[in-house]
């Protein structure tokens, strides 16, 4: 089943999930999660896209080449998404993209940036943070972006146990979809 339009789940549910993640994060930390990318089958034909389950669980967003950044400081919590910008030519062939301008409202996040700006924006957003929740080797394209951003953290934690535990318990909306 394609996760694309299981968005029979209200956006508030994804927001609540992110709030539960924030509650488990330590202050002055960030959680970074990358989406899947499109996988080429041959020449100009891709395999059907399937979103990363963890990324979809926190965003409900079904486009490739995106990243979710959750930032928790002593003062505030912020959800930021990096995604592909709109491209009318490519959208003619591959379907509409959400785009940076509409992402904050549609995904209920605080800020949105082009994924092309990750290397410059990620260091600015995380410069005063001391810890990162991240799973290395899950998405090599994302690990490369992270390495190129040249941000160093005092501690790195694995987010997978936290999110896996959360995903065990299904909401009434999820049960209805099963």
Residue ranges with predicted function:
Residues 1-177:
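A composition/biophysics-driven feature that prefers long, compositionally simple stretches
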């Amino acid at each position: 089943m394609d996760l694309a339009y299981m968005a029979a789940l209200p956006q508030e549910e994804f927001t609540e999930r992110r709030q539960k993640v924030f509650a488990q994060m330590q202050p002055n930390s960030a959680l970074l999660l990358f989406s899947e990318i499109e996988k080429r089958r041959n020449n100009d034909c891709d395999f059907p896209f399937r979103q990363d389950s963890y990324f979809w669980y926190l965003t409900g967003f079904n486009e490739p080449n995106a990243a979710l950044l959750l930032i928790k400081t002593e003062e505030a919590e912020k959800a930021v998404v990096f995604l592909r910008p709109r491209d009318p030519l490519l959208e003619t062939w591959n379907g509409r993209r959400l785009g940076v301008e509409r992402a904050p409202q549609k995904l209920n996040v605080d800020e949105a940036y082009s994924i092309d700006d990750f290397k410059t924006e990620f260091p600015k957003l995380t410069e005063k943070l001391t810890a990162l929740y991240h799973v290395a080797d899950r998405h090599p394209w994302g690990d490369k972006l992270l390495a190129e951003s040249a941000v160093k953290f005092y501690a790195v934690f694995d987010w997978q146990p936290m999110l896996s535990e959360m995903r065990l318990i299904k909401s009434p909306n999820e049960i209805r979809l099963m």
